[in-house]
């Protein structure tokens, strides 16, 4: 009985979160449906599980975070992901963003610098029977050139500037969403959307954000 009540409460909290995202301007029904179909509580530790459907970031292992649901929804909506697209995610983290993307596109390739995080994320995706995500440990700043070009790229850590190696792995007409440090403004970041065109790139600044920094190389873990 208690378990059923807990499940009912979780579903109600999820519905309230989705309604809140709509009120904040998220309109893409496919994106909202994807978030509704991914159980966020599966991607966080038991300590914070009761906060799974509150609209804020939560800590995960290795000093990283699972992003605020609004930011996940906003970034995903701004990517305009199509069903047949191939998407690169830089920064697997808990695996939550990859799970959301998996509901929207043909295949997700995701890179994580922490082996511990990647192992746990892959297990969560397997438990949810998500089979269109390919993951590896690696340096996200280098992208995944063996699988390039990508229709879309999403970066879930803040870069000091737009990573050219990632831009180079976009298809022409492809989009990338990346948090970028604001030059001369300590600690400030802007979410930036990059479109690769035939003669260069178009850059559009979207909104202020706060992400953990994009760190080069594979993490050394004890």
From Swiss-Prot:
Main location (coarse class): cytoplasm
EC nos: 2.1.1.77
Regions annotated as coiled coil: none
Location of the active site: 67
GO cellular component: cytoplasm
Subcellular location: Cytoplasm
Biological process, per Gene Ontology: methylation; protein modification process; protein repair
SUPFAM superfamilies per UniProt: S-adenosyl-L-methionine-dependent methyltransferases
Protein family (similarity comment): Belongs to the methyltransferase superfamily. L-isoaspartyl/D-aspartyl protein methyltransferase family.
Protein name per the record: Protein-L-isoaspartate O-methyltransferase
Organism name: Parvibaculum lavamentivorans (strain DS-1 / DSM 13023 / NCIMB 13966)
Organism phylogeny: Bacteria, Pseudomonadati, Pseudomonadota, Alphaproteobacteria, Hyphomicrobiales
Gene name, Swiss-Prot/TrEMBL: pcm
